[in-house]
Swiss-Prot record:
This is Glutamate-1-semialdehyde 2,1-aminomutase. Belongs to the class-III pyridoxal-phosphate-dependent aminotransferase family. HemL subfamily. The keyword Plastid does not apply. It comes from Prochlorococcus marinus (strain MIT 9215). Its EC number is 5.4.3.8.
Amino acid sequence: MTDILNYNKSEEIFSAAQQLMPGGVSSPVRAFKSVGGQPIVFDRVKGPFAWDIDGNRYIDYIGSWGPAICGHAHPEVTTALQEAIEKGTSFGAPCVLENKLAEMVIDAVPSVEMVRFVNSGTEACMAVLRLMRAFTGRDKVIKFDGCYHGHADMFLVKAGSGVATLGLPDSPGVPRTTTANTLTAPYNDLEAVKKLFSENPDAISGVILEPIVGNAGFITPEPGFLEGLRELTTENGSLLVFDEVMTGFRISYGGAQEKFGVTPDLTTLGKVIGGGLPVGAYGGKKEIMSMVAPSGPVYQAGTLSGNPLAMTAGIKTLELLKQDGTYDKLDSTTSRLIEGIIQSAENNGIAINGGSISGMFGFFLCDGPVRNFEEAKTNNSELFGKLHREMLQRGIYLAPSPFEAGFTSLAHSEDEIDQTIEAFDESFNAIKN
């Protein structure tokens, strides 16, 4: 492993970028604000690795924030894309590839009987909220503290991801009237949800959540929590929506709803289903989805929705994921990684708790367990920043925020896991004092 990496070109390019783009980035967490140090400018990726513009190689545990589940630039995906691009980049009209990916999603995800493709997870969540309200005739929605459903105005209330990373309470520019119907509760707290329903009779359109929180760190549902939400929403004539933009096709082929055996009414998807290209989707029961235009009155549209390149990458990625043993391998790889991380911290007397499910993991530098966003905020963020910088110097690229989950891929081998655990040993030893 490299002791001191040269970031000269990254520094030069990022300095120029700050004069061209707000903060020098196209998405806030990339600016390293919460961890300090020099943001890395990447040049190329392949398998489990990423190379920066200075030629430094990293073992990557971000995976483009989740989509690269088969490894970066998988040859079957890139070959399929090369063939598809010869036919054009976008049609702005129906194409048979939409049918094929739709069939695959419907076949895999228990709640989805019909699906609409969009261009991002944010778009999917915006559209699904409009649909929830139209179907129920109610305006209010319940979300959970620290859960992130994109940057649409109505969801920027106690949000996770970059909002949590930057320590923002909400966002300026969002009128109070826009979020007046957004109710919040602590994750894993059924009693708080019951109270909201009792205080707002016949007014709540539904509950939306990340079934596994990945945008406030990595927080799993306690036994009975998802089941309880299913019962509460049904009893109150409301809809249950799983935001599986992150967990869909990652923790199992059918997502969190398959893993936990709880079927929502509607589901949002993204990341993995685009194979690394911009994509989003929302789907659910036919009686609800039939309200979406042009079948029904709920309007939603997109110039590049269902474009042939994203559909091609998604189809090929799902074909790879459907092969036998895929999720067993992800689970084995990631379990070994998180066990090694926790053991390394404990060996150095550093408080830690964490976990993993399939190809998704996370840890907090604090005593656990962490069951919600308030408890996640007890994480030692200063220590995490030091850890991140030490790991970067050892060629390991972690999410530059303690409030983001990490990801493994099918391309991560035992060698990469061994190198990573060794780097954690060295890094924890370096920062413990």
